[in-house]
């Protein structure tokens, strides 16, 4: 090459290089923007927990940074999801007088937006007879589905949802099938490979040439997201909204993937499944485009782009249209709040009793505890009840004896920091030398029984053996079927003891391990301070967890303790009782200024929320005088249980005139009935959370609708306990409240449908309604509706705190999540002092104007 040619080549290279670099830089920027939009969409999805650890979750949790009405508009336009109560439900409340003219007038006065819009009571009443004018933005799949030339028996949207859902079910299953897919390359790669071998999907969707399009799919999820989003030609400003709308078409599986991400973050890790699910759902739209001609594609792009150009305007229009729905939401809440305010003021004036307290009983804050606490206090003035989060402040995971089935026993917001295991502990100290040998024997016995059971059940999971298994084992299942058809009076079963020799079950006790004495003392001090039990302890202190009892119920964990991650509170109560009864721990507490009298004994117990019976644990460890007091309590428990069962009987369609024994028998049979879809109502009806001394709610009937947490501001000079209550239990109760709210307002999209049609997916992932569709999240219809009427009223939580205003404001200012909840209308916040109630509204307090209607 000549010198001139070399110089010319260098000049050309120098000229070309800047443009090449700019093109690459522009492409990198585009890819970054796409990744950011995908991440933003993924962050909008709230998690859902597996069936065996089911806890209630606000499905809009990731959107609380926006006002409720804005979220309602987004959900309607992007996902066809209803956030406020349906207008027919509100019309019924108005017609029946549940919402009064005074409630409506007070609401219009309370909402500045309603005043600015000039809404009158007449306007609001008229609006109840029509649906809000809302326009749903289409996705690419919707545009293609509307093509008049499409000839299939099933809409493409339905077919795609079914295919994606079945793929996810196979991929995530770890408990149901003995064969598991290869997961090392991720969900997207598994879906792509599955699709390549699915020769029936083309026939189902009327796309005989889809195989060629599948082969052209990008290899990675990131490339698929870029490939699709670049082709759609949508304005960048709406990318995240479009992608969120895509995820809402498979919201159930998106929520499951969000749970995997949530758990990974608790362990300081990352999880990519939600992004891969988004890529799968996006890629399906592009696949359909590959199967159509260019003219049809061009028309689809034009239609989609025109619709999404107006997305911001449609969202604003929806927000305006839903103002009336927000008015009726508040009016429904004010109708309840009037009665609540009157009760709280009257209770605050009641003088405390003078009888000496012989027993203190700490219950979970769960709304089902409130009627029983009230009944116990009525039955015997010598008992004082307390409200505390049902995990009793123990940040633990529990592993039953001879298993590796480690499970969290604390709120889903937290990660376990300590471990609880089972050990054989004899009651008599002189027998404890033999405990190690008994434990070894128990472990061997249990492992043997598990092995036999697993081999037996495996026969039903291999395809070739399924029918022969049914023929061979059919008669063996008649016993269980008989128990369901003719339910007996069996007590609540304890799965953690399954397979253990009966003679060892009573001395198999859960306890903390790996915790030094100083750490034990610190933990005990924190728990007692949180309960307000730092002085004047009674001779007996009950730690009463709670658990439900039902048969053949995939959602049984949802009726147990949410603070224990869908488990009963037994493990936490028993572990804490053992800890607080340790002499060395008590000595250490003395040094911290917490004097636990030597005669005080802590006793673990469990409230069966289905039958309202109380069961005690480790009673053989109690001294004689405590055993005598426990026997005295049995009559108190029976009397209180009778009262609560009679209160509950009308809502369960039981005979309220039946004898006490007959009512208890009916509830026990109900708890063992495998055909019973409504063993109890769980937390249906929940509407308030009261953080105050028990005196504030003592003696008043709160109808099992209030969470109750004891709190004495005079003992919390630095506000640290209040901060903990507003950032942990308040968030948990908010989650519960909004899951019930969401499942009532949109049972189709945010509820799990009909229990009678449920099929469990992957052993514990969730349920399908029938054999397909999206994974269903939320509560079943039978958990909210009695067949004629809704049992749950969709009210946002009213939080009532008896503490200095400055202390409450300090927590709000310090914690963004709390500020978002109160400022964006996700809950109501009241301050109570003496006989005065005040309402918090964006940094200001105003007198609660709730005159009786």
UniProtKB/Swiss-Prot annotation:
This is Probable inorganic carbon transporter subunit DabA. Its cofactor is Zn(2+). Its main location: membrane. It comes from Methylovorus glucosotrophus (strain SIP3-4). It is a peripheral membrane protein. GO terms for molecular function: zinc ion binding. The keyword rRNA-binding does not apply. It holds the Pfam family DabA. One of its GO terms (cellular component) is plasma membrane. Residues 7-21 have a biased composition (Polar residues). Belongs to the inorganic carbon transporter (TC 9.A.2) DabA family. Forms a complex with DabB. InterPro entries: DabA.
